[in-house]
Regions:
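Conserved beta-loop-alpha segment that forms the PLP phosphate-binding cup at the N-terminus of a helix
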Residues: 41-54, 59-89, 98-105
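PLP-dependent aminotransferase-like
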Residues: 79-139
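Glycine-rich phosphate-binding segment of PLP-dependent enzymes
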Residues: 9-59
Length: 219
């Protein structure tokens, strides 16, 4: 008998979901941007998905952007925000135990002239808010902290970190990689002071972007 214990990373697809997806791929396969009947039917599924996610997160539908996966969501959030806000500063903050999708993107941004501070963690894998406070500067344009660590499961004090960031500089953007945490923890971007939230349903993902924020297009 097989025992699978990695559901937080990738969960086995429910039979009813697989059945619906098979129907969509075989029958309702139109481009949701097209005006013909197949496109209209496909757009209904997309709209329903956005309505459902917006209701769960307590955000507006227009604040949700669908992507191909968690890595694209993280890349778009970090690079897009860095490029769009480079005139305000060039300092970014993250942690030493982020997913490679974050760490490698931060290293790329360093090659483009951005300064990055990597926060250490305590023995339980959690950041210290005092370290975050000391790392913040007037040049800090973005802070990225994961919700749940993909290796050790450590939960970060996201709401407290978000409140601290906004207290010190309301213009500093707060990005949270919640690929591992969404669906297991209650995550409300507005309540938790989150400007950008990356989530994956494996492998269709989305990024939440606060309504008045902008991203520089990557493509």
């Amino acid at each position: 008998m097989e025992v699978y214990m990695d559901n937080s990373a990738t969960t086995r697809t429910f039979p009813e979901v697989a059945e619906l997806m098979t129907k969509i791929m075989c029958e309702d396969y139109g481009n949701p941007s097209s005006l013909h009947m197949k496109g209209v039917e496909a757009e209904k599924y997309l709209r329903y998905a956005k309505e459902t996610l917006a209701r769960i997160l307590k955000v507006e539908e227009r604040e949700l952007l669908f992507t191909s996966g968690g890595t694209e969501s993280d890349n778009m959030a970090l690079i897009g925000c860095a490029l769009a806000n480079c005139r305000r500063g060039n300092h970014l903050i993250t942690t030493q135990i982020e997913h490679p999708a974050i760490l490698q993107t931060m290293r790329y941004l360093e090659t483009q002239g951005y300064r990055v501070t990597y926060l250490p963690v305590d023995p339980c894998g959690r950041i210290r808010l005092e370290d975050l406070r000391r790392a913040m500067t007037p040049e800090t344009i973005l802070v990225s902290i994961m919700h749940t660590n993909n290796e050790i499961g450590a939960l970060q004090p996201i709401e407290e970190a978000g409140a601290l960031i906004k207290q010190m500089n309301p213009d500093t953007l707060f990005h949270v990689d919640a690929v591992q945490g969404f669906g297991k923890s209650r995550i409300y971007p507005k309540k938790m002071h989150i400007d950008l939230l990356s989530v994956s349903g494996h492998t269709v993902s989305y990024t939440h972007l606060r309504a008045h924020e902008t991203l520089r297009h990557l493509v």
